[in-house]
Amino acid sequence: MAKRDYYEVLGVSKTASDDEIKKAYRKLAMKYHPDRNPDNAEAEDKFKEASEAYEVLSDSEKRSMYDRMGHNAFEGGGGGGFGGFSAEDIFSQFGDIFGGAFGGGGRQQQRQRRGSDLRYVMELSLEEAVRGVKKTITFTAPAPCEVCDGKGSKNPNDVETCRTCHGTGQVRMQQGFFSVQQTCGTCRGQGKIIKNPCQSCHGSGVADRQQTLEVTIPAGVDNGDRVRLSGKGEAVRDGQAGDLYVEVVVREHEIFQRDGADLYMDVPVSIADAALGKEIEIPTLEGRVSLKIPEGTQTGKLFRLRGKGVRPVRSSMVGDLLCRVVVETPVNLTSRQRELFKELQATLDGDEHSSSPKKKSFFDRLFD
């Protein structure tokens, strides 16, 4: 089943402010929270859907990516979607706004740690960017330690639950009328104490490792577009790995220049073909096509080939190819060619106004 538009899920416009997005999510979260709707699968699905939408639209970078690429921005790693995010973590951002409103408001939970997001720059040809491509990338990033299986200790018995916070990673301090939750200083928020750390990772549970992934780049991407690979960023012990963002850089093309959905190119035309007119062949991204050059074509004349441009991500419209004529003046003339040009020059000197319309308008303006 196709995912709904995130703005539609929250019931806000695409120009909604951060505050409007937060209020919309809070309203839906209050309505569909599982504690208010026990054994209601439909309410649980709506709560998760709203939380997923809020996770993206409340983050300026993710929102910008979504506005440009839609759900494609987060489905490049094969796994798709938002496999690792926690709706409860998002929900907890509202703190005491919800505290005590639901059955679980008073219980203490360990906030799951999350690794840092990583960035990988992928260089593409224009053809790859326009058509989409699958590429294999290799990079080095912190991954679960293979010696201790990411536990921080080879022997599970050497890992104890922190006695200060009882494994939650946080402690509650009473300050007057208010109860404040803080990171446990004994275990530093880990919830566990390692008595005998792994010698390979020194108890961190992670180690740098070379990784290889296949990335699917959707058709129509442009410079600066990013694809998110959920959970492929920095790994952390007893926590959620960050994401890997693959940023697209499109190499300069020898023929075409891209501007949004449109492509531009210069078409060299001989002075004879420009004067007399001719049907020529030009390249496009889909193969060669014919272009009719009318008699008397001047440098700078633009011809538009509709539908020969690019279909951007999240668009059903295909741009155009705009061909700019560049009339070439011949060089290294033979003696015969020089004679012919002199003859032509002699015939044009007395009739330059009719044969050179731009020259005529130039001198008319000059002497007005």
Swiss-Prot record:
Self-association state and partner proteins as the record states: Homodimer.
Residues where Zn(2+) 1 binds: C145, C148, C198, C201
J domain segment(s): 5-70
Location in or out of the cell: Cytoplasm
Gene behind this protein: dnaJ
Cofactor descriptive note: Binds 2 Zn(2+) ions per monomer.
Positions with a binding annotation for Zn(2+) 2: C162, C165, C184, C187
Domain notes: The J domain is necessary and sufficient to stimulate DnaK ATPase activity. Zinc center 1 plays an important role in the autonomous, DnaK-independent chaperone activity of DnaJ. Zinc center 2 is essential for interaction with DnaK and for DnaJ activity.
Cofactor(s) demanded: Zn(2+)
BP terms from Gene Ontology: chaperone cofactor-dependent protein refolding; DNA replication; protein refolding; response to heat
A family per Pfam: DnaJ_C
GO cellular component: cytoplasm
InterPro entries: DnaJ, DnaJ_C, DnaJ_domain, DnaJ_domain_CS, HSP40/DnaJ_pept-bd, HSP_DnaJ_Cys-rich_dom, HSP_DnaJ_Cys-rich_dom_sf, J_dom_sf
Chain segments carrying region Disordered: 349-368
Annotated protein name in UniProt: Chaperone protein DnaJ
Keyword annotations: Chaperone, Cytoplasm, DNA replication, Metal-binding, Repeat, Stress response, Zinc, Zinc-finger
UniProt zinc finger (CR-type) residues: 132-210
A single GO molecular function term of this UniProt record: unfolded protein binding
Regions of compositional bias (Basic and acidic residues) in chain numbering: 350-368
CXXCXGXG motif repeat locations: 145-152, 162-169, 184-191, 198-205
Function field: Participates actively in the response to hyperosmotic and heat shock by preventing the aggregation of stress-denatured proteins and by disaggregating proteins, also in an autonomous, DnaK-independent fashion. Unfolded proteins bind initially to DnaJ; upon interaction with the DnaJ-bound protein, DnaK hydrolyzes its bound ATP, resulting in the formation of a stable complex. GrpE releases ADP from DnaK; ATP binding to DnaK triggers the release of the substrate protein, thus completing the reaction cycle.
Family, as annotated: Belongs to the DnaJ family.
UniProt cross-references to CDD domains, sorted A to Z: DnaJ, DnaJ_C, DnaJ_zf
Annotated organism of origin: Acinetobacter baylyi (strain ATCC 33305 / BD413 / ADP1)
